Amino acid sequence: YYTMFGPDDARKQKIQDPTTHEGIRIQMLFGCPFAMSAVMMRSEAFRCSGVQFRDTMAEDYQFWVDLSDHMHMANIPEHLFFYRRWENQLSTSQLDRQTLSAQAIQRDLLRTTLGMTLTDEESRIYTQMNLRVGTLRRDELTTYRGLLKRLYRANSERRAYDCLLYTS
């Protein structure tokens, strides 16, 4: 949970990421479930995991995906952190590169956990859905619906995620 604000925001945006480890793992299929600056953890747990911070555009996202296999994670359900957006921050000025990096992480996660490989069209729509940008055309909704069905079926077969949480 955190509150995001920026120079052109008429109001603050309250972000509520999942609070449970399983909910966080599911959220990782769609994006990073943490505000990096607000994270606390024991350094010993991190050192014992053997996970290394990778040098990529979405390094925090990849870090949490890697670390989620080694430790239990949670978000505190209170808005205790303010995240300020500004024009020149890396995630804004390098959005295209960061999006490509996040797409690669998501494709790898879908492949390793659910055995899914996305077509180029599915990948484009998946990204558009995750970023909540633009408007999907009517014909894209069919692809979107099919993609969601594939995600559900793949999880039903592999049981990688809690089915009750996965459908909510």
Protein language model features and the residues they cover:
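Conserved donor NDP-sugar-binding/catalytic core segment of glycosyltransferases
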Residues: 1-12
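Flexible helix-coil transition and linker loops at the boundaries of alpha-helical arrays
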Residues: 157-162
